[in-house]
Amino acid sequence: MPLDSLTLMIVYTVNVTAVAFGLSVALLGQGSRAALCAQAGALAQAIGWICLVASGFFRDTWGDQLLSTLAMLLMSLSLALLLQAVRKWRGSPCLPRALYLAALGMPLLYALGFHHYPWRVGLANGVIGAQMLWLAAEAIRPGAPGSWRWRSLIGGSMAALALVTFWRGVLGAFFTELYPTFATPHPVNLIGSLLNNAATVLTGIGVLAAFREEAEAQLKTLAITDGLTQVLNRRAWSERAELQLSDAKRYGHPMIMLMIDLDHFKQINDRRGHATGDQALQLTA
């Protein structure tokens, strides 16, 4: 049975919208910044593809240019947001705000050169492919926290999509007669459409797995630390002390224990209130 590029793109748009809705419901109300970035990225990707498919119904009109440019903006932004989420889950610093502004540069140049087809196709696919490659590299980068399971799902999906995206950009920029429209039934386009559907599902699973890992780490931290001072609680401290003492005895290392006591702490609570007493504990900790 022959595959139709436009039909595959419409199916993908439905799939990515469903995944965006599913992630929004699954992660609804979660305070994690990484989870919020992942939700926003999925939503931006879904709206971007809706705009791209809709632009095909306004061929050679101002609506085509407007919807296509908006699609490029949202797709670029979605990858930046997913990259931010992955970096947060891996314990890396946040992306500089300047990089978000840089994501606006491609859609602007895309709009200015919209009527030059090779330029806009090469530019858009080149920039988006580079973002995918960066995201894949960040996900599979060794040495940082994060289970290899969810990292391999996201990293592998993005690497495969980056390869096809670069290929599509080369065709549009240098072999335009082989790829005159985004719905052209070229093998690269068909492969890209199929990969999009698979990668969206795998990336969604990877995001949920990463969030679960983050939630488990938070629960573990809550179980072994004091909620006010964030220092080890009595149970965790006793377990840690036994291990340290055993190591000191085994290897003959000296060991020092320091105990800090706050004088007149009850008077602080009685005279200035428990809120001030809590602040004193936090300052000492």
Predicted regions and their residues:
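Hydrophobic transmembrane alpha-helical segments in integral membrane proteins
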Residues: 1-17
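Nucleotide second-messenger and two-component phosphorelay signaling modules
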Residues: 243-256, 260, 271
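Juxtamembrane segments at transmembrane-helix boundaries
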Residues: 18-37, 47-183, 190, 200, ...
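Conserved nucleotide-binding and Mg2+-coordinating catalytic segments in signaling enzymes
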Residues: 220-239, 260-274, 282
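GGDEF/GGEEF active-site signature
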Residues: 279-285
